[in-house]
A protein has these predicted regions:
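N-terminal pre-domain segments of enzymes
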Residues: 3-55
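Glycan-recognition and catalytic cores of secretory/periplasmic carbohydrate-active enzymes
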Residues: 18-21, 49-51, 87, 96-100, ...
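Catalytic cores of eukaryotic secretory-pathway lumenal/extracellular enzymes that build
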Residues: 37-43, 61-63, 87-92, 103-104, ...
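Short, ordered coil/turn segments that flank beta-strands lining enzyme active or ligand-binding pockets
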Residues: 58, 153, 285, 704, ...
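Electrostatic cytochrome c docking/interface patches
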Residues: 61-77, 211-215
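Local sequence-structure signature of Cys/Sec-based thiol-disulfide redox active-site neighborhoods
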Residues: 70-103, 107
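Loop/turn elements at helix/coil->beta-strand transitions in domains of secreted/extracellular proteins
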Residues: 78-82, 114-116, 153
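Extracellular/lumen-exposed scaffold segments
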Residues: 640-805
Length: 805
């Protein structure tokens, strides 16, 4: 694609000028252009983009164009080399290179004359970024942004690097342009050598189908994988290297603690969380977390804040609080949610990130100046000075400080110093937002809100998750198609696999809290999952249905507010859009996903798709989903290093074999739900008096037409519903009063006798009896529920469900 030249001032067309005028208020607000400029000197095609990062390059003299899906097969560059530059809005060095090089007319002349120049927002096109980042890591040992690549017209790498100053960058693009003109064969030869390094011929391997991983194999491998991650977390601190939170590792270890009771795993996570919360990487004043630290001791944050970081940390803190009951986890979680709601919420969802830079200086919003701290005008009691920075401002050295919490022993939000520090910070200029709404990131946050609700029972978290998912459904889905990005009210960019998967996962998670579907809905679902050839989803128009009909999911989900229906529609669309063999059986989907990213700051796409399919299968009993899930688990690499890189998937497989639940569960193949909640004991008793124990309420909801046997059964062949406490201390057997509801007496199709049943919604209460203050909460480990679900026609196998409070 040849862009209209922007090399000469004012050479752009009227269409670009019209778009500029429409977007001028936003550009002025972001200080990209002055309000008194009516016709800029340069406008390029990025003015049409739905990315704040790309828009910041839209008035540069370079003839930039956006990445397009068609570039995967053909750049249409004619005989020109292709220059691809990848970055993102909160990347400091991306903006430095933009000012030094891409705003420079001499460099623009070279690029415009000799290259097709493509600018990529890595958050819009994560797989494009992943491909070139992996190549840079292979060739140079490490990768960073901006990520700059020069390609042949066929798309083979000729040169790749990250930030270069203006002189070095000029030398590279000039040299390769001249060589391309004079010795194109030499360029092709160089590209072939690089291609051989980046994409070598695969080594012969055994066919995974002939040596699949069975459940028994997984059970043998899993303990080693958890131990490997545990050791990695302990050894993480290496001098001079950046440090990330490792939420994926910590969540997996907490789950394994729930399964095994291995205290070392819990201790490792608690130590890591304490270090984070007592460091400036946690913003204890506004709430929320910076992305990572540039040092190994959590002292110097990289100051940008990402929506996905907040989502991951909310989920981690919710689980830590659910397991330990320690209030500082809940406080940090609540603060982070409050920050996201205040800073990131917009009409279509939540903005993707907050920049590190304010007033032209990295981290300035978070710094405290020497004068207020030294003079005592700002009360910092309960906080500590962690790091000091020296800045050269107008030839004067100015001292700035970072502060963090000094203790986690009390609610820091109640400190006088906390209020004073908030007041001091409000005087500062806030860093800028990247307002684009990313479907997958927003879905992660919706899931995090549900995680927070499940351990706090705070209704606003559930309400916010519902509102967010509805906003995404309305804003990111147009004419039956999902899009990845919503920016300034406009949906764009084809969805990535992670968008389908995480949006579907969020919908299925929400379905737990929605009313059961009606019988009509169930019939629609049954028809949709009917099989035409043994393993195939019914297509929108296929040989197994009438030509005038459309897929039940495709039509109903577009208007249905049922989260489960919407989740299934998203999975159907994912399988269709990433299908290449026309069979809709998941084979080509699986082939694509095996080459996608490994765990990083976010869990891998492989894991996200697997988890979405697992939830979809639970709610729909789809044989297609079940078969594809089996392919994921059986065909995964046996190599320890591959399992380490996909630890989020390893954790998910472990959970499928032995669920690590907190206070809720789905049972009866999706036809029943349980949630348990603990209310504190009465602590108003006098000193040295015993207090009444807390009450655990276990709430069951059964789908219409399903039931479980009552606690007392008429015949021994029926399994009664029982609930009991499992305690840490075997010799501390405080009496527990368990109150079961009155059963309903009914006669069903499979029995001539009247049966005592529980159906619909019912509750079982466990009261701790007379115990010392707080004893129940300390010694309680879990609740064991024995249950058997039946419909009017059949009974499922009995289940034992363990919940942890």
């Amino acid at each position: 694609m040849q862009p209209a030249s922007a090399n000469n001032a004012g050479s752009f067309n009227d269409e670009l000028l019209a778009v500029f005028k429409a977007r001028k208020p936003w550009l002025v607000n972001r200080k990209i252009v002055s309000s008194h400029i009516f016709t800029p000197k340069y406008i390029n095609n990025l003015i049409n983009s739905d990315s704040p990062y790309l828009l910041s390059h839209s008035l540069q003299p370079v003839d930039w164009i956006e990445w397009q899906p068609s570039f995967e097969s053909d750049f249409k560059s004619g005989d020109k080399l292709v220059f691809v530059s990848i970055g993102y809005s909160t990347c400091h060095w991306c903006h430095v290179m933009a000012e030094e090089s891409f705003a420079n007319t001499d460099i623009a002349d070279i690029l415009n004359q000799s290259y097709i120049s493509i600018k990529v927002d890595r958050e819009q096109w994560p797989l494009v970024d992943e491909r070139f980042k992996s190549a840079l890591e292979l060739l140079k040992g490490e990768a960073g942004w901006p990520l700059n690549v020069i390609l042949t017209p066929e798309g083979k790498i000729v040169w790749i690097d990250s930030y270069l100053n203006k002189d070095k960058f000029t030398k590279v693009i000039q040299g390769l342009a001249k060589r391309w003109q004079k010795q194109p064969k030499a360029i092709f030869s160089l590209a072939s050598r690089i291609e051989a390094t980046v994409n070598p011929d695969p080594l012969p391997t055994s066919n995974p189908e002939t040596n699949p991983l069975s459940k028994s194999d997984w059970r043998k491998l899993l303990p080693k994988q958890h131990q490997s991650v545990y050791q990695a977390l302990l050894n993480e601190q290496r001098p001079g290297e950046p440090r990330f939170f490792r939420e994926i590792w910590q969540l997996g270890l907490l789950d394994e603690y729930l399964r095994t009771g291995n205290e070392a795993y819990l201790k490792a996570v608690e130590n890591q969380l304490s270090e984070i919360l007592l460091s400036p990487v946690f913003d204890a004043i506004d709430g929320s977390f910076h992305r990572y630290t540039v040092d190994s001791e959590w002292k110097t944050p990289h100051f940008e804040k990402m929506l996905y970081t907040q989502a991951n940390m909310i989920t981690l803190l919710a689980k830590a609080y659910g397991i330990t009951g320690k209030q500082h986890y809940r406080i940090a979680m609540e603060q982070t949610i409050d920050w996201v709601e205040l800073w990131l919420k917009n009409d279509s969802g939540y903005s993707s990130a907050v920049s590190a830079i304010s007033e032209g200086q990295e981290g300035k919003y978070y710094h405290f100046s020497e004068t207020p701290l030294d003079s005592g005008t700002v009360n910092v009691a309960g906080f500590k000075v962690v790091n000091r920075f020296t800045h050269d401002i107008q030839n004067e050295n100015v001292q700035n400080y970072l502060i963090s919490l000094d203790s986690l022993d009390s609610d820091w939000r109640e400190l006088t110093s906390y209020q004073e520090l908030k007041k001091y910070r409000k005087q500062k200029v806030k860093p800028e937002l990247d307002e684009k709404v990313i479907v997958s990131w927003n879905s992660r946050y919706a899931i995090a809100l549900l995680d927070a609700f499940e351990v706090t029972d705070k209704a606003e978290y559930l309400e916010n998750s519902i509102s967010l998912l509805e906003s995404l459904w309305q804003a990111a889905k147009l004419d039956g198609e999902l899009y990845r990005i919503v920016f300034l009210g406009r949906a764009s960019i084809p969805p990535q696999m992670e968008d389908y998967a995480l949006f579907a996962k969020a919908q299925f998670r929400l379905a737990f809290y929605q009313p059961w579907q009606t019988e009509k809905d169930d019939e629609s679902k049954r028809k949709f999952y009917a099989q035409s050839d043994g393993n195939r989803v019914v297509e929108s128009v296929g040989e197994s249905i009438d030509e005038s009909e459309t897929s039940i999911m495709t039509t109903s989900a577009l208007h249905d507010s049922s989260a489960a229906t919407r989740g299934n529609w998203l999975l159907e669309q994912m399988m269709i859009h990433f299908d290449e063999n026309g069979e809709h059986d998941g084979k080509s989907l699986y082939a694509k996903i095996t080459n996608l990213n490994t765990d990083g700051e976010q869990s891998s796409v492989y894991t996200s798709v697997y988890e979405a399919l697992a939830l979809g299968e639970l709610y729909s009993q789809s044989p297609v989903y079940k078969k594809l899930i089996g392919r994921f688990t059986k065909n995964h690499s046996h190599l320890p290093i591959e399992m380490f890189k996909h630890y989020s998937f390893v954790s998910s497989v472990a959970d499928s074999l032995s669920p690590a639940r907190l206070n809720h569960a789905i049972f009866a193949k999706g036809h029943g739900r349980i949630k348990a909640f603990y209310s504190e004991p009465n602590l108003n008793s006098k000193p040295n008096e015993v207090s009444h124990g807390g009450v655990i309420k276990v709430t069951f909801t059964m789908e219409n037409g399903w039931h479980v046997n009552a606690n007392s059964v008429s015949k021994s062949r029926f399994i009664p519903t029982t609930v009991k406490l499992d305690r840490d201390v075997a010799d501390s057997q405080t009496d527990t009063d368990i109150r079961y509801p009155e059963p309903r007496i009914r006669k069903l199709g499979f029995s001539d006798s009247k049966l005592a049943l529980y159906e619909g919604r019912f509750e079982i209460f466990l009261e701790g009896g007379v115990i010392q203050e707080g004893e129940l909460q300390k010694e309680l480990k879990s609740i064991d529920i024995r249950i058997q679900a039946c419909s009017d026609q059949l009974c499922l196998l009995p289940e034992t469900i363990k919940l942890n409070l």
